[in-house]
């Protein structure tokens, strides 16, 4: 018999809003609410069920639009009884939250959890260019509670030498990888172009891709006025986009709570393996720039927990980090529809 405290993912929602008129554009809070409504629909439950949330977590935006986004969201969706947290931004953040709260649900510390986040920098930039400020703030008498400390990514030595942004650091990694592989500069550039060309092929058919355009390896690898170097050797077409209007929400709960809410078992997605690791935090202290032993350990742990090998994985999602974060904490998970 399956443990009734087994954590399951019951609903997800994703929203992409491209180039809306300024007076009709959604705020980040609007986008999160829309994604949450879609997650409810995906789970087959009603908005009233959100009053049962025990915790909601919002992943911090690059530029937080208000003093206390989790509180504003809780008020908007009538989940004021839930614990409300703001999680620092970072490429591993969403998956870390799934791993953390799945464990908390299994232990009985949590029962029903909403994980959300949004960016509306595309609209925000358009509003600023018009000479105005985004009217997105919601009054609060307190700052949002951070789920964990927002740790600085660089030390004084790195800052002194201009190594503190992702566009400063990832080129060091890439050139170390190139040297490790024994590639020439032109060969490595086209190799990166070939990789991102395959990714652009996936984006071409995705309704949520900000640029659903298939590009050739040469188009991606070659710097042009419309494809400038962002941080050599990376061109614009190799970089993640931060000036977007997108959001996502995810609902986690236990089997017994899902049954209480009447969620169809066909909607249950089980977490079969998970792992979180922290690399050597400051890059200047790392043994080299071309390998990450922690990534290897993380992948092995999650796959071993699931009883699978990498060739058994049908869908693999790798997070592409954009400014201002860079990868030091890494999370991994294996999901399956089967128990």
Please state what every model-predicted region is.
Residues 1-29, 141-160, 171, 175, ...:
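Condensing-enzyme catalytic core mediating Claisen C-C bond formation in acyl metabolism
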Residues 49-59, 84-88, 114-118, 188-194, ...:
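Beta-strand segments within the central parallel beta-sheet cores of soluble alpha/beta enzyme folds
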Residues 319-339:
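Single conserved hydrophobic/aromatic residue that forms the stacking wall/gate
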